[in-house]
Amino acid sequence: MRDIRLIRAPSNLGLRPLRPGHVPGTWRGPEALAGLVEALAPVAVVDLERPAYSAEAEPGTRLRNGNAIRRFKLELADVVAKAIGRGEWPLVIGGDCSLLLGALAAARRSGPVALVHADGHSDFRHPGNYDVNAMLGSAAGMDLALATGRGEALLTEWPGIAGPLVADEAVVQIGERNSRDPDFAWADINATPITRIDVFTAREMGAVAVLEKTSAALARADCPCWLHLDVDVLDQTVMPAVDSPGSPGIDPDDLVAMLSPLAVDRRCIGMDMTIFDPDLDPTGELARRLVSLLGRIVRPA
């Protein structure tokens, strides 16, 4: 059984406020998911300090909280890299999706890395597909674009790493639910070598076939991989406590069947789980559901 280092990263920096004065509640995710300590029996728990959130623009960047995001991701990268160096398996609990950048920056210190991006959205917004002067960018909706080198240098260039955090060819995106909409915001992802399995295709193929296609893409990449799980990949009837809920979504049992074999594979060097908002879970029922789900993925019976 692998040694898990549980890294709790209480960040909401990459999210937009949903209304004036709103502060996204994802920063409370790690605390609400405290049951993971008992469920996963990690060898250690690391708590990062919550960074201050601001909804306002700042000089030198069109990314909301851009400078704070970079600082926090560099801190996270150091913690994740130390875990990998010890032979442990870092599990980062957020927090918003921009945490992925810090995790990948850590993984890349040891060489190329592949990425399985399980998310109800491709998070591929970048200056090539929206007007940066019309609105502030939210890094949590841009994480895959940033990870593949598209966007401001503030979040695409990292110390000691040449090129993007991950190559297009080494990415598998699972679960996008808006890709067939006529106004799909980042249709340019379709012109990339990223392996894309939208939610409709995933449901048609079934979990076994999705796993086979994902595994084949990872074999071609031929390098260690990182797993990213945004819990909005689940249907909103199952997991409504997220920033951008939607339907359809991946069935929880299917998600376990798709991700658990990847998580326990020796070439998987870590995982993050993001976007759960406890403010939208007043009873704690959804938090308990996520603890159970993650336990099934990373500690299968």
Language-model features: locations:
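Conserved alpha-helical scaffold segments that buttress catalytic/binding sites
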Residues: R2-A301
